[in-house]
């Protein structure tokens, strides 16, 4: 199934949600390299094309900064559940339920840091699509998110395909093949 076919199925399911005063929150989760970001962007575009006012909120905007990770000896594990500000993300999701103007942080991969207030979420938005690895994780503080989602999607992909995609991702960021493979095996696939 292609990302566009999946997106159309998600659109149809979301269109069947009962209307309510609060925003509908949709979670798209899965491992690194599964295609969450691509799928979330396609779904967001489709929903907006269908006059469903929708904004996208990536979980990656809640990476802890590199200094904090270094102090905690977690820099080599960046991307693991404990390397995110899960309490801050949960608070944002609580606030996104209500139709008011908000700003959300985004992760800038080119500088490996979070950019605060990088995306504006206008009050008139009716749907929020959140995407990230741990949105449906049943562990520690992450499990507190589960009941906020009105619709949930988990993308499952064969581990060999993930490995190949993740190595390509690191190669595109000017890492050697051995560096890329080491990062994928030591960190990305573990996450």
Q: What role is predicted for each listed range?
A:
Residues 39:
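Hydrophobic positions on the alpha1 helix immediately C-terminal to the Walker A/P-loop
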Residues 112-169:
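ATP-dependent NMP and nucleoside kinases share a basic, alpha-helical "lid"
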Residues 115-117, 143, 168-191:
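Small-molecule kinase domains that catalyze NTP-dependent phosphoryl transfer to phosphate-bearing small molecules
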Residues 36:
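Conserved lysine of the Walker
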């Amino acid at each position: 199934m292609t990302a566009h076919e999946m997106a159309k199925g998600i659109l149809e399911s979301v269109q069947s949600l009962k209307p309510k005063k609060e925003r509908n929150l949709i979670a798209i989760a899965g491992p690194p390299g599964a295609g969450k970001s691509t799928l979330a962007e396609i779904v967001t575009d489709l929903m907006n094309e269908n006059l469903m006012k929708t904004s996208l909120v990536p979980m990656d905007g809640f990476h802890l900064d590199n200094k904090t990770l270094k102090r905690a000896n977690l820099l080599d594990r960046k991307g693991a559940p404990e390397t995110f500000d899960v309490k801050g993300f949960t608070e944002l999701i609580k606030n996104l339920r209500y139709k008011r103007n908000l700003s959300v942080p985004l992760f800038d991969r080119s500088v490996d840091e979070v950019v605060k207030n990088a995306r504006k979420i206008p009050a008139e938005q009716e749907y929020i699509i959140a995407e990230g690895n741990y949105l449906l994780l049943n562990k520690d503080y992450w499990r507190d998110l589960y009941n906020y989602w009105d619709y949930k999607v988990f993308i499952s992909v064969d581990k060999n395909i993930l490995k190949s995609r993740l190595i390509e991702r690191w190669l595109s960021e000017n890492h050697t093949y051995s560096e890329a493979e080491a990062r994928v095996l030591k960190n990305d696939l573990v996450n």
